[in-house]
């Protein structure tokens, strides 16, 4: 079972962790948007090549990345400053969205295995 199937996910940061989370969420059937403060992060070409359906946004991490959208979860790369991501994280929490990172994706994957396959 793909527990993220059809869910719109926002990934903050396109470093190694952000790319890994994006790949995982795509495998799970999520609709994805990736945001990075850099206009052309090093992994942007990899993202476009491997996952051309993923939307990329550059610029500051602001609340309108999620407000008025269908985003249901926000995952943050661990290398990002919490101060930098705060506007998006606060808005996501206020909207009741799932907020996390690589570890929370891993934990949820294990919970899904336990629920669906008695793992």
Regions found by a protein language model. Give the residues of each.
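N-terminal leader/targeting and accessory segments in enzymes
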Residues: 1-108
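Nucleotide donor/acceptor-binding cores
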Residues: 7, 117-119
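Conserved adenylate-forming
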Residues: 109-117
């Amino acid at each position: 079972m793909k527990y993220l199937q059809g869910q719109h996910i926002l990934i903050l940061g396109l470093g190694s962790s952000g790319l890994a989370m994006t790949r995982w969420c795509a495998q799970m059937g999520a609709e994805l948007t990736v945001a990075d403060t850099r206009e052309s992060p090093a992994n942007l070409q990899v993202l476009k090549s491997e996952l051309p359906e993923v939307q990329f946004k550059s610029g500051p991490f602001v609340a309108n990345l999620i407000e008025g959208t269908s985003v249901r979860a926000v995952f943050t790369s661990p290398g990002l400053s919490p101060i930098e991501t705060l506007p998006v994280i606060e808005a996501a929490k206020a909207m009741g969205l799932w907020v996390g990172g690589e570890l929370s994706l891993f934990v949820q994957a294990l919970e899904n295995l336990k629920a669906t396959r008695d793992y």
